[in-house]
């Protein structure tokens, strides 16, 4: 059956700031306390979406979350009105305020893991929400992510949205950032590659930075998504690269159809994995980048592999890259050599995503890939699909509500909370989502 890959990109939230919350993500740590520009950040993301949509790649949007997230502060024992809580936490525990104000839901590669209908035992599209258990600020996301996905993928005859796994370290799940699908045509059955960093009975794990994804979680997600057991491979990421800042697999590898583009040091037992994929995937091609041409540290600094690999109508592929790749002499030299060689990657497109990149999120972090047949695509909430009208509406919306400068101190401003809620309220109408946010369900603006 004919199907296409639709990229659902996360909209950057109004509280986008640099707090260094993500240990193991070196860009996040390096840019801690810098001044951010939320309006520029959301517009950089929108420009990428629109440019790719105009080039014929189907695009859709996933909204940001409610931030600062007052219910989490109440769980932590802060009391009073919303404004009083903001004041208390800013004075007593500013780190918590930063955590509950994180705009990290914009990186929707961590929102869920997707199984196309061609791979599922029941013939439906499955999405399992990620629990993001390793980081407090990200573990807050799952309930609202689930509500948003249910508002986008409403038709239960076509889509199954599964709640996140239990919030325990044993089942740490980071979503599609640790998942690749390989195969031929999108509408044909493919091979799903789940990548993990640790497993309970295995002592091979990183020493410096945490391995966020467990094998146990990957196996559970594959079961929930009803992936045909004959079409699944579980592979361990090289713990040495996790210790060099590769906190998700999509920082060191990206796949599309029959191509796996990765660093030569991406996986533990990489040769075994490559041979396994060669056996399972017709026409499989591994493009392994040698350390002599691009080191792991340069790959992390430029987010070479946090790129999008997109299929064009003629069968060739486009590599969507952050500007940091173009700015790095060695990486850019390698890329120009790559597109000149005999392989499906024949073109590159560079985007300025510096606001997201400074927090450790490149083009691939910002998107969730969902393979859909024409019938399934018609069943998606049409209001989230990117087109000229939505692009114009979202830019006007961002101009109205987003600040062009934000510091950690600004997070305590009760006006920011009010602006955010008003913006999201308008967005839910614009995208026909219903009342997906807790503040809408309580009906209280002041707690």
Swiss-Prot record:
| HAMAP family in UniProt | AstB (MF_01172)
Q: Which GO terms describe its molecular function?
A: N-succinylarginine dihydrolase activity
Species the sequence originates in: Salmonella schwarzengrund (strain CVM19633)
InterPro entries in alphabetical order: AstB_sf, SuccinylArg_d-Hdrlase_AstB
Q: Which UniProt keywords are given for this protein, alphabetically ordered?
A: Arginine metabolism, Hydrolase
Give the superkingdom in one word: Bacteria
Q: Which family does it belong to?
A: Belongs to the succinylarginine dihydrolase family.
* Catalytic class of the enzyme: hydrolase
Q: Where is the active site?
A: 174, 248, 365 (nucleophile)
What are its GO biological-process terms? Answer: arginine catabolic process to glutamate; arginine catabolic process to succinate
Record field: catalytic activity: N(2)-succinyl-L-arginine + 2 H2O + 2 H(+) = N(2)-succinyl-L-ornithine + 2 NH4(+) + CO2
Q: Which residues form the signal peptide?
A: none
Function, as annotated: Catalyzes the hydrolysis of N(2)-succinylarginine into N(2)-succinylornithine, ammonia and CO(2).
* Subunit text: Homodimer.
Residues recorded as binding substrate, renumbered to this chain, are 19-28, 110, 137-138, 212, 250, 359
Per the record's keyword annotation, is Lipid biosynthesis included, yes or no? no
Report what the protein is called.
Answer: N-succinylarginine dihydrolase
In short, the EC number is 3.5.3.23
Q: In which pathway does it act?
A: Amino-acid degradation; L-arginine degradation via AST pathway; L-glutamate and succinate from L-arginine: step 2/5
* One Pfam family, short name: AstB
């Amino acid at each position: 059956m004919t199907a296409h890959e639709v990229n659902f990109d996360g909209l950057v939230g109004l509280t986008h700031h640099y707090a260094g919350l993500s240990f193991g993500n070196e860009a996040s740590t390096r840019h801690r306390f810098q001044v951010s520009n939320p309006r520029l950040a959301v517009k950089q993301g929108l420009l990428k979406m629109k440019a790719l949509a105009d080039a014929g790649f189907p695009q859709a949007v996933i909204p940001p979350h409610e931030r600062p997230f007052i219910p989490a502060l109440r769980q932590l024992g802060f009391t009073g009105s919303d404004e009083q809580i903001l004041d208390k936490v800013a004075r007593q525990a500013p780190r918590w305020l930063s955590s509950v104000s994180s705009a990290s839901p914009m990186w929707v590669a961590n929102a869920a893991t997707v199984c196309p209908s061609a791979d599922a035992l029941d013939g439906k599209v499955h999405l399992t929400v990620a629990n993001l258990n390793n980081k407090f600020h990200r573990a807050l996301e799952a309930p609202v992510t689930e509500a948003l996905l249910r508002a986008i993928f409403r038709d239960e005859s076509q889509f199954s949205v599964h709640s996140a796994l239990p919030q325990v370290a044993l089942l740490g799940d980071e979503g599609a950032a640790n998942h690749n699908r390989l195969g031929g045509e999108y509408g044909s059955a493919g091979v799903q590659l789940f990548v993990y960093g640790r497993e309970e009975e295995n002592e091979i794990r990183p020493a410096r930075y945490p391995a966020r994804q467990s094998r146990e979680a990957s196996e559970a997600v594959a079961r929930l998504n009803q992936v045909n057991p004959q079409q699944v491979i579980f592979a361990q990421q090289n713990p040495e690269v996790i210790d060099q800042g590769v906190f998700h697999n999509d920082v060191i590898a990206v796949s599309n159809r029959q191509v796996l583009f990765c660093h030569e040091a991406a996986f533990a037992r990489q040769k075994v994995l490559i041979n396994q994929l060669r056996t399972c995937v017709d026409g499989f091609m591994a493009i392994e980048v040698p350390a002599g041409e691009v080191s792991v540290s340069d790959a992390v600094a430029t987010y070479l592999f946090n790129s999008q690999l997109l299929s064009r109508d003629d069968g060739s592929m486009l590599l969507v890259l952050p500007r940091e790749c173009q700015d790095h002499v060695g990486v850019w030299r390698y890329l120009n050599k790559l597109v000149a060689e005999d392989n499906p990657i024949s073109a590159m497109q560079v985007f300025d995503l510096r606001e997201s990149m400074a927090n450790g999120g490149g083009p691939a972090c910002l998107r969730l890939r969902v393979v859909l047949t024409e019938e399934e695509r018609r069943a998606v909430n049409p209001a989230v699909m990117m087109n000229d009208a939505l692009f114009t509406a979202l830019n006007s919306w961002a101009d109205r509500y987003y600040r062009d400068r934000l510091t950690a101190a600004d997070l305590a401003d009760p006006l920011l909370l009010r602006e955010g809620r008003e913006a999201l309220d308008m967005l839910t109408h614009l995208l026909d989502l219903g009342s997906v946010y807790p503040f809408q369900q309580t009906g209280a603006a002041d707690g």
